[in-house]
Every structure is written in structure tokens, then in C-alpha cells.
A protein has these predicted regions:
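Short flexible linkers and secondary-structure junctions
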Residues: 1-86, 91-101, 105-108, 122, ...
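Acidic, low-complexity, intrinsically disordered peripheral segments
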Residues: 325-348
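Periplasmic alpha-helical coiled-coil/stalk elements that build and connect Gram-negative outer-membrane
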Residues: 72-180, 270-273, 277, 297, ...
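Bacterial Sec-pathway N-terminal export signals of envelope proteins
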Residues: 1-24, 43-46, 53, 59, ...
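Small/polar-residue-enriched beta-strand and adjacent coil segments characteristic
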Residues: 16-72, 185-187, 192, 199-259
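C-terminal hydrophobic structural anchor segments
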Residues: 271-306
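Eukaryotic all-alpha helical interaction scaffolds
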Residues: 111, 116, 196, 259, ...
């Protein structure tokens, strides 16, 4: 709004505020019957091309503010993406912890049954009970962390639940907001340079005046006139303004080049990380499938009395590690897609 308000000046028929002035003079000697009164009215005039150049600075300034707002929106989207994935990661960890509790309780029942029958020592039943308690403790901690991350996400989003959204797919972005903002800054600096070039001197002023003279001897008289004032252009005035405008163009152009390099580097890095994350997720799924099959065989062997409790828990621990890694790898692969979209400037 502050930038757009300058358009009011550019649309005005005069280049600034009008001026009203006056003066009264009287004789100091004699009967003081001679008096003179002046009334002036003047206004600054636009220089050739100055008005259009000022409108150009307004348009480019508004465009820069809009582009900066888009960039800020992308930054907020990045924070929301990060908070959402933190919540989903914690929820996935709580789900794995719950599965650990369920399997631990199932094994504990089998171990207790065999211990009651005398097939295995009672110490192995205590081992199963200890594992169940450890699983329940880990689940309580994971559930508390998930609740905390969900609460953080709700605070950021104003009460929205992370369950209302689904993982986003990789999308091809249009022009990146950071590049658009940098280009808008260059255009604003160029428009300012054009305004400096169109204003080589202060604005001329055109005015009218009226004079009323009262004199008992010579008689009263009234006169009207036109006054015109044209400031002269000097290097002492213009050189610093040109240098400042050129320096601003140089600065914004350098920032644009830097933004292009950073955006390209961030996009390439995010795409490479996505390929690695997807490969890791495939390997983690394969490992989990093997671990589940191995656990099923070990559990069947335990129930048939072919293996002991320690061997079963060792195989089960491998499956739990594989499940944790698979969950983490799956979330990381989906998060890598969001990072690619963020690097490409895609707003969800």
C-alpha cells in the first residue's frame, strides 16, 4: 500500500504540492499612507518523461512487493512441510512401536504357556515379560513424541490435523519465487534509474501573482503577473543520484545471478537426494520382507520346540530393526519429494 500510494503523486497534474504566499509592505516614514500587498500562487511542473518514469517506479515497486510476498509464502510452505513430515515420522515410529508391543505380548503368551508346561525354564518367561515391558515403554515414549509433533503442527496451522493431508507427488514448478523476486528487484532498480535520468533538475515552478498598491498621492493600482522559475541542471546534483541508481542495478543484478545459482544447486541436490532416498526405501522394503519371513520361520520353530527363546528374540530383534529402518526410509523418500517441490518453488 505504501508503494502503491506513490501513484497518487504520479497521476496528479502537478509534480508536487502547490504553494500560496503573500506579503504586505508599508511606509515607515511620513504619514504611512503607502501600502503594498502581494498574493502569489504557484505549482511545480512535470519534467518531460518524469511522470511516466515515476509511474514506472510505482508499478515495479508493487510488483516487487508481490513477488516478495510469494517468496515468503514459499518459505512458510517449507516450514509447514517440515512440521508435517516431523509429525508423520513420529506417527510412523509410534505405529512400529505398537507392532512391537503386539508381537511381544504374543510371544510372551507362548513362552508363558510353554513355561507352565515345563518345556522351557521360568527364566525365559521372565525374559519375555521383560521384553514386553520394554516394548510398552518404547511405545509410550513414541506415542508421546507423536502427540507433541502433532500439537506443534496444529499450532502452526491453526488447528489442522496432519491426517487431513496426503503425501504430495513431485511436480514441475514454474518460475521459482526467489528468481521472480530477484528479477522484480532488478526491474525496480532499472525503473529508478530511468526516473533519475528523467529528472536532471528540480521541477520548474509556474505561478501567478497579484499586487495591490495603495498610495494617497499617486493613486491606487492593481497588477497581475506570471512567475516562472527553472532550476538548472548541475553535475553536483546529478552525479551522486546516477551513481546510486547504477550501484543499485549492479547490486540487484548480482543478487539475481546468485539466486539463479542457488536455486539450480538446491534443485539438483534435492533431486539427487530423492533418487538416493527411493533406492534406500526399496532396499529397506526388501530387507523387511526377508526379516518377516525369517521371523515367521523362527516363531514356528519355537512353537514346535525346535528353537529356544533367545534365538527367537534375536530373530525378532532383526525384524524390529528392519521395520524401523523401512518406516524411516519410506518417510524419508516421501519427504524427499516434498523437498524437491520446495526446491522447485512449488507451493502446496
Amino acid at each position: 500500500n505504501a508503494v502503491a500510494a506513490r501513484a497518487i503523486t504520479a497521476r496528479s497534474p502537478i509534480a508536487g504540492s502547490p504553494v500560496v504566499g503573500g506579503a504586505i509592505r508599508s511606509d515607515l516614514r511620513g504619514p504611512r499612507e503607502g501600502r503594498e500587498m502581494d498574493l502569489d500562487f504557484g505549482a511545480p511542473l512535470w519534467l518531460p518523461g518524469q511522470r511516466g518514469a515515476l509511474l514506472g517506479t510505482v508499478d515495479t515497486g508493487v510488483a516487487e512487493v508481490d513477488r516478495r510476498s510469494d517468496l515468503r509464502r514459499l518459505e512458510v510452505a517449507g516450514a509447514l512441510r517440515s512440521a508435517w513430515w516431523e509429525a508423520r515420522d513420529a506417527q510412523r515410529a509410534a505405529q512400529v512401536a505398537r507392532e512391537r508391543v503386539n508381537t511381544a505380548q504374543g510371544i510372551a503368551r507362548d513362552v508363558a504357556r510353554r513355561a507352565n508346561l515345563g518345556d522351557i525354564p521360568p527364566t525365559e518367561a521372565l525374559l519375555a515379560r521383560n521384553e514386553t515391558l520394554a516394548a510398552e515403554l518404547a511405545f509410550a515414549q513414541a506415542e508421546a513424541l507423536a502427540a507433541a509433533t502433532v500439537a506443534t503442527y496444529r499450532t502452526i496451522t491453526g488447528g489442522l490435523s496432519p491426517d487431513t493431508l496426503s503425501p504430495e507427488a513431485v511436480r514441475a514448478g514454474e518460475a521459482h519465487p526467489a528468481l521472480l523476486a530477484a528479477r522484480a528487484s532488478v526491474e525496480r532498480a532499472q525503473a529508478q534509474a530511468r526516473l533519475v535520468a528523467a529528472t536532471p533538475r528540480d521541477n520548474p515552478e509556474l505561478g501567478v501573482f497579484a499586487r495591490r498598491e495603495v498610495d494617497q498621492l499617486a493613486g491606487d493600482s492593481t497588477s497581475l503577473g506570471v512567475r516562472f522559475r527553472v532550476p538548472l541542471a548541475t553535475e553536483a546534483r546529478n552525479a551522486p543520484r546516477r551513481a546510486e541508481a547504477e550501484a543499485e542495478i549492479t547490486r540487484t543484478t548480482a543478487e539475481l545471478a546468485q539466486a539463479e545459482r542457488l536455486v539450480n544447486a538446491d534443485t539438483a541436490r534435492a533431486e539427487a537426494a530423492l533418487r538416493v532416498a527411493e533406492a534406500n526405501a526399496r532396499l529397506a522394503r526388501q530387507r523387511l520382507d526377508v526379516a518377516r519371513e525369517q521371523e515367521g520361520i523362527a516363531l514356528a520353530a519355537f512353537r514346535n520346540g525346535e528353537t529356544g527363546t533367545f534365538d527367537l528374540f534375536r530373530v525378532r530383534q532383526l525384524r524390529l530393526e528392519a521395520a524401523v529402518e523401512e518406516g524411516r526410509a519410506a518417510v524419508e523418500a516421501l519427504r524427499a519429494r516434498s523437498r524437491v517441490n520446495q526446491a522447485r518453488g512449488v507451493v502446496p
